[in-house]
């Protein structure tokens, strides 16, 4: 990873230095930049491919200048250091925009977290790495006139990217599409986007309530966080609207269970849910330097003619043995058979068995498939899913 640009000698050089810092963070493939004040200096850390790592350390005296410049760029209160603040900046000099900034007071000073934005158009559904059957199922769900499409996974799993790809795939000319988000992460032409503002009482439920009076065809709710939002989203899906939303849950079946715990009756879920999709992001092994995983790889090559299970090595091109990330997906299309099984009280393992019988692999199945092909490592599957792939 490249070194930081030299510290500026004069205060008037600070803006150019900060722009260069942001540009280098982006070039390093970082999704987040952390500025962490400590007793002996300020540590800059980057999150790359979902994993945090130390970048550089700068003198403690420079922390206030760096924080001040970023706060000015994000139009935050420069004098307020006691309370957390949230903002957004765009920096033409660094070549990146739509950077989310969050500050946090700590015992050593203000910590900053910068979520580096992704400029350009919304992602294409065909570039998400979905299998042909999964892509077809998602496309069919998006063509429905009403119902609920639920994307689930933990923070950092790529749910928002998938939502934006879904919205971009819709016909914006013949449908009125509106969103409620926290925050708006990407501007989509032809779509009415609203950001929640909790400080003035503008939360998901209140915006959704207002949007339903705006004659929408498609609604995107950034996240279901409470009973009221869950109830309103399901009611909207029942009354002639296609609703796309996300939920924090570990799997497709867990997402349905979570909605049940939020007060949505089973029969209502069976009637309104069109598709649930769980997803994760795994680090893709660098094809230049990946190393076969002992004798197991030879057996896999002989049996499948694939590259076989591999582990990360690291080279000058990739730095840490990884080259980007790859998505794994678990789909639960709510057809009549699965809806009946859900209403009959079939437990999670039973529902997952039904999914496999219908040809819908689980997250662990997809991870194992990529591992056997040498695209991801066993260690990364353990990091993301909590268990290693079965041999």
Task: Write out the residue ranges for each language-model feature.
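Short, flexible helix-loop junctions that flank or precede catalytic/ligand sites
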Residues: 2-391
